[in-house]
């Protein structure tokens, strides 16, 4: 929607793709205002793992790490290690000295995340992924979503519908709309770099890309400001309407 302003960006890393069978091991989130200025009292100068990322308008950065069961740790996960750099062999919750806990068995972590998700729209790239994991792993999320307390904004359809650089080809029939490609086209990620595949770092380039993209669309009278645009936050939400 053309009035969207304060949003919470979020990205999760997991040990697989089935939310009923795998584990959330990394959650990164931060906030950004799409219209109003960055809060003057928000700490500045946050340092991301990728030193060339600049915090810019982002604030409230948070990175949360979680563990896996002993059996999962013993098997390891080479695919996830290669993709994210996270070695689940070091994250067994059964180790006496382990500081890691299972996210889906940690009520306080779930409550804290849900409270944040309810306070403003949350943004994710291919938000269906995050939404599916939250539905099964965050107590109260499904009820809150059904009651209309959750609004989800997805940058994937923004890329598909409104990014003119998303050109269909043989490899990408609907255009290349990965976060990596979208962020590069919107100037949020240098062409020589790659998406990091860590929650907070990926959240950051997503929000930077989204804000730049909205600025372009506004200036050109397209997207939310075009003929089919609408006021308000937009996004996807549930809840009864009378």
What is the predicted role of each segment?
Residues 136-141, 161, 165, 185, ...:
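Active-site catalytic microenvironments for nucleophilic, acid-base chemistry
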Residues 185, 200-242:
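Acidic two-metal-ion nuclease catalytic site recognized across multiple nuclease folds
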Residues 153-174:
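Short alpha-helix plus adjacent loop in nuclease-associated cores
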Residues 150:
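A cross-family kinase active-site recognition segment
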